[in-house]
């Protein structure tokens, strides 16, 4: 009796141990890989590939071995029932089938990588060694007499021994290249192996679902409503309702069987029918319990979406300027819109996938207890095949879906670029080119889309065929048992009802897995955004710059956007509080780079930038920027009213302050001439305003901000001469008592600057006042002479036109 219990336990423990070993190993490796990648070389890759080829053939032999063992067991159970041995049992048969499925699944081709068993597979093989050794001990413990029938038993014994040896060989082959490589790394003192190409190697099959889960763990804190106790209680109660739904799913077919069993008694079983109807009312997503759960979950789902999308938006705004300059706005916008994909994924995972898996395991256990192991085996086999085919085909569909999403992004990005560059497109008569370009991208998208839909229909047909085959086998088996008086008709009804219930979650899994893949592919870009780290951020212990006198110091500053091409080299200068400094030079000399460093869009590579003697890197970015006001060369306005754009600098400003700032910028009268005045819509990026109007709005906005340090990036470059003179006077007024740093193209606007810095190829070549630099007869003097000559020629031409 004790031996029989051990035998039964071994049969169930064998496949469970292998699968759990594999899954736990995958999870551990995924968590480890999140923090570290291993590095190997070309020698290791060559020998690893050879070892994997040998493992493939060994695993194939393993599958043949198990197939023979399954055949012998089935033969002994059905053709020669007089065979009495512990392995002639349904549990042993089920165990071998489960192990066969695991090994056979590993042999199927992967769409992304060639056959490459992972470290997790080796852990499962080690578990197989232990379990096969226990089976061998079971065989050796039998005391069957030698007879004709015992030859079959000894054949089974030989098959177990072969499997044990094969498992050991597979493990040895897997670890041998690793061991040899580690010895080479320890003993190597010179490059005897030739050139070694180091690269990160992942020993798990690429893109596994556990890797996805671990990768998305960055977003897990946004999924649980940790900021609301009320929402947490709602979520917990929803989980309780899920458990109740699982119980109801068992009771419905069981109660139907009871009703059918009592129908032949000559009386109507009203009570049992009422119980069945009540259970049916509670069952399913549209039942009473499911509806209550869905209503309770709505605020939890909304809270998750709000936290996720708001955090993503905040994170993108916190990223450094380099990220925004290097990304296409259409792609970033598309990624930010994928918060709903993760929200949908969470809802499906918690309330659809987990309940479905629970229902399938409960069904297998129910069939085992209520019927026998054959029914449980059939359910497990059909379920496994259904899920495996779904996941396996979804690997190909995932790649196709990713290709389709990439084509869609390119299509959307091209459309966004063309619309945002409307004037440029028409200036260059490029409308036909943009239309043809967009049409080509649409065709590429539809080609990828066709394969996605084709593979979906193929998957659905395969799933239906598998489930129909399983139902047919169960019906035939149950019908045979009923005809042999081994089961009652009521059990047939219960069986078919339960199978019908299982079809819904299985069919759902097909669509859900596809939906999950779509959601994860869609959300990959959002995850990538969260993984982006700002190059410039507050260091630990950074201080707040509460007050600022306005002293600015550049000390031996070096900086480069690309290390191969320095933008600034050994730049040093000081701007005293309340003084003005102008920076001039040819295009690409580094003028705008200095403003970017002042605003801390970038940090210096060497040297320091100091404000009132404090290194900019030692103060918080927000407090530093609160003392800076910028009038950029290219003003970008929000697609809102003029008033909104003006108040953006200081939302609490009064209308009188807004009017004063606009008068100082010579734009108030122009605004009042508009039909809607300050409520005039400026259009996308301010396209409804002229360049000069946008520039004056930017100047007025800076006046309203009233910073201690003014940064003017060719602030009057877009203005005509008359307006420039008006603005220049206003700029002189607001600059009194404030530090002003001006990037100038027109040298006539900076003649009164306390200090002029001349840049050439990232270096300071001259420094001084206007008069000093003219007297030096250097680069500044040449630039002045060139611009003066051009202005005189322009004025002369204008005079001739007036005379004519």
UniProtKB/Swiss-Prot annotation:
Belongs to the ABC transporter superfamily. ABCB family. Heavy Metal importer (TC 3.A.1.210) subfamily. Gene3D superfamilies: ABC transporter type 1, transmembrane domain, P-loop containing nucleotide triphosphate hydrolases. Residues 552-786 form the ABC transporter domain. It is found in: Membrane. Keywords: ATP-binding, Glycoprotein, Membrane, Nucleotide-binding, Transmembrane, Transmembrane helix, Transport. InterPro entries: AAA+_ATPase, ABC1_TM_dom, ABC1_TM_sf, ABC_transporter-like_ATP-bd, ABC_transporter-like_CS, P-loop_NTPase, Type_1_exporter. Glycans are attached at residues 460, 639, 797. It is a multi-pass membrane protein. The gene is aclQ. ABC transporter; part of the gene cluster that mediates the biosynthesis of aspirochlorine (or antibiotic A30641), an unusual halogenated spiro compound with distinctive antifungal properties due to selective inhibition of protein biosynthesis, and which is also active against bacteria, viruses, and murine tumor cells. One of its GO terms (molecular function) is ATP hydrolysis activity. This is ABC transporter aclQ. ATP binds at residues 585-592. GO terms for cellular component: vacuolar membrane. Residues 236-518 form the ABC transmembrane type-1 domain. PANTHER family: ATP-BINDING CASSETTE SUB-FAMILY B, HEAVY METAL TOLERANCE PROTEIN. The chain crosses the membrane at residues 3-23, 52-72, 97-117, 119-139, 155-175, 206-226, 239-259, 349-369, 373-393, 464-484, 489-509.
């Amino acid at each position: 009796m004790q031996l029989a219990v051990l035998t039964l336990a071994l049969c169930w423990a064998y496949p469970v141990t292998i699968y759990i070993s594999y899954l736990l190993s995958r999870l551990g490796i995924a968590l480890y890989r999140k923090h570290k990648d291993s590095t190997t070389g070309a020698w290791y890759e060559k020998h690893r590939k050879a070892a994997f080829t040998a493992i493939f053939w060994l695993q194939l032999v393993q599958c043949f071995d198990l197939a023979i063992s399954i055949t012998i067991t089935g033969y002994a159970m059905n053709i020669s029932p007089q065979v009495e041995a512990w392995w002639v049992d349904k549990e042993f048969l089920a165990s071998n089938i489960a192990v066969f499925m695991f090994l056979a699944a590993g042999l199927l081709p992967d769409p992304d990588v060639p056959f490459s068993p992972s470290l997790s597979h080796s852990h499962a093989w080690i578990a197989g060694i232990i379990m096969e050794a226990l089976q061998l001990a079971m065989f050796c413990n039998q005391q069957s007499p030698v007879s004709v029938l015992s030859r079959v038993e000894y054949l089974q014994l030989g098959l177990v021994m072969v499997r044990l040896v094969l498992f050991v060989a597979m493990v040895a082959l897997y670890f041998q290249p690793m061991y040899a490589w580690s010895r080479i790394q320890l003993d190597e003192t010179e490059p005897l192996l030739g050139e070694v190409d180091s690269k990160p190697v992942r020993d798990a099959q690429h893109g596994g679902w556990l890797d996805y889960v671990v990768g998305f763990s960055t977003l897990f804190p946004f999924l649980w409503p940790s900021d609301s106790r009320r929402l947490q209680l709602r979520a917990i109660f929803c989980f309780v309702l899920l458990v109740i739904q699982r119980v109801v799913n068992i009771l419905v077919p069981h109660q139907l069987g009871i009703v059918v069993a009592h129908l032949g008694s000559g009386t109507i079983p009203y009570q049992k029918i009422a119980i069945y109807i009540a259970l049916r009312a509670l069952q399913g997503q549209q039942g009473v319990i499911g509806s209550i759960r869905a209503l309770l979950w709505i605020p939890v789902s909304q809270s998750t979406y709000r936290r996720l999308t708001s955090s993503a938006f905040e994170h993108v705004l916190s990223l450094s300027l380099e990220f925004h300059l290097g990304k296409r706005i259409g792609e970033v916008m598309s990624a930010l819109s994928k918060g709903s994909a993760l929200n949908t994924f969470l809802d499906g995972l918690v309330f659809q996938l987990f309940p479905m898996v629970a229902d399938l395991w409960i069904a297998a256990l129910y069939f085992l207890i209520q019927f026998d192991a054959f029914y449980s085996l059939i359910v497990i086999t059909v379920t496994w095949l259904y899920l495996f085919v779904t996941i396996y085909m979804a690997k190909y569909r995932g790649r196709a879906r990713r290709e389709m999403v990439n084509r869609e992004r390119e299509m959307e990005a091209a459309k966004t670029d063309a619309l945002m560059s409307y004037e440029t497109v028409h200036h260059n008569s490029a409308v036909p080119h943009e239309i043809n370009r967009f049409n080509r991208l649409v065709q590429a998208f539809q080609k990828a889309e066709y394969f996605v839909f084709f593979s979906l229909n193929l998957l659905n047909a395969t799933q239906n065929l598998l489930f129909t085959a399983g139902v047919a086998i169960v019906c035939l088996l149950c019908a045979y048992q009923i005809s042999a008086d081994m089961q009652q008709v009521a059990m047939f009804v219960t069986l078919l009802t339960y199978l019908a219930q299982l079809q819904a979650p299985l069919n759902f899994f097909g669509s859900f897995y596809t939906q999950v893949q779509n959601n994860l592919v869609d959300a990959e870009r959002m995850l990538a955004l969260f993984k982006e780290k700002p190059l410039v951020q507050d260091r630990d212990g950074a201080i707040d710059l509460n007050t600022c006198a306005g002293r600015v110091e550049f000390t031996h500053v070096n900086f480069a956007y690309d290390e191969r091409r320095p933008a600034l080299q050994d730049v040093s200068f000081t701007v005293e509080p309340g003084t003005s400094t102008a920076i001039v030079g040819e295009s690409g000399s580094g003028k705008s780079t200095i403003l970017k460093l002042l605003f801390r869009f970038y940090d210096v590579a060497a040297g320091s930038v100091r404000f009132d003697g404090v290194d900019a890197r030692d103060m918080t970015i927000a407090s530093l920027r609160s003392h800076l006001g910028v009038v950029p060369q290219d003003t970008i306005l929000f697609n809102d009213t003029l008033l909104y754009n003006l108040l953006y600098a200081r939302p609490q400003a009064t209308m009188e302050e807004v009017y004063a700032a606009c008068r100082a910028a010579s734009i108030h009268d122009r605004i009042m001439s508009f039909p809607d005045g300050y409520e005039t819509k400026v259009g996308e990026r301010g396209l409804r305003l002229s360049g000069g109007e946008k520039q004056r709005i930017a100047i007025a906005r800076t006046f309203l901000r009233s910073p201690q340090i003014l940064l003017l990036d060719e602030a009057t470059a877009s203005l005509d001469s008359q307006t420039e003179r008006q603005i220049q006077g206003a700029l002189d007024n607001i600059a009194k008592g404030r530090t002003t740093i001006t990037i100038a193209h027109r040298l006539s606007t900076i003649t009164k600057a306390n200090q002029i810095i001349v840049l050439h190829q990232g270096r300071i070549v001259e420094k001084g006042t206007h008069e000093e630099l003219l007297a030096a007869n250097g680069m500044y003097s040449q630039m002045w002479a060139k611009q003066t000559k051009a202005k005189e020629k322009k004025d002369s031409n204008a005079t001739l036109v007036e005379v004519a």
